[in-house]
Amino acid sequence: MKKAVVVFSGGQDSTTCLVQALKEFDEVHAITFDYGQRHKLEIEVAEKVAKDLGVAAHKVMDVGLLNELAISSLTRDDIPVSHELQENGLPNSFVPGRNILFLTLAGIYAYQIGAETVITGVCETDFSGYPDCRDDFVKAMNSALVKGMDRQFEIKTPLMWLNKAETWALADQYDALQLVRESTLTCYNGIIGDGCGDCPSCDLRKAGLDDYLNNKDAVMQSLIQKQKSEDQ
């Protein structure tokens, strides 16, 4: 039996990955992390979407310690989300160590249930400037976890080389575009669906959706070509 663990926030990217995983694996587990993020609604959205999609299990883990250590606009209500980069070249929504912790815990969970695949929706093409969304970071984490647990498994990143328009196309491939558009929470200001329309996350999401809806055939063809290249 092919099992997979999906790191699941209830946002556009991780929901698209979850929909795909449910088609490709026999048993899919979702794991969501409560790190004291800006909007608790994120946890509720993840629980509802996971239930509606019928995952084998959905585990919500309390990792509140991350909130104490990682100061960010996503972990502090008194820090407004900014469109500008900080002096270190990163957006103030970057949560240091978040994906290091998440992938480590997801790997441990996969070990316990006998899953050989961990799936995360990080993306280097349209990422927000986060260093822990890069392909070389994921490969390094994969290597470290395999060595540290002496177990072969793979961290898969289905969205790594897709732009946001192609991510929408991928959701549409699995007849999940409306689900992703209406039921997910990507907005930094905590508004489900199309969001506030003002924060950096909403800007990226809307630009990708508009691109896809206005150029469906071309975007879908680009997605299919990338999928073929990956399979070779």
From Swiss-Prot:
- Supply the InterPro entries for this chain: QueC (IPR018317), Rossmann-like_a/b/a_fold (IPR014729)
Q: How is the cofactor bound?
A: Binds 1 zinc ion per subunit.
List keywords of the entry alphabetically: ATP-binding, Ligase, Metal-binding, Nucleotide-binding, Queuosine biosynthesis, Zinc
* EC supergroup of this enzyme: ligase
Residues reported in the UniProt entry to bind ATP: 8-18
Q: GO: which molecular function terms?
A: ATP binding; ligase activity, forming carbon-nitrogen bonds; zinc ion binding
The protein in question is named 7-cyano-7-deazaguanine synthase
- Which organism does this sequence originate in? Vibrio campbellii (strain ATCC BAA-1116)
Q: Which gene encodes it?
A: queC
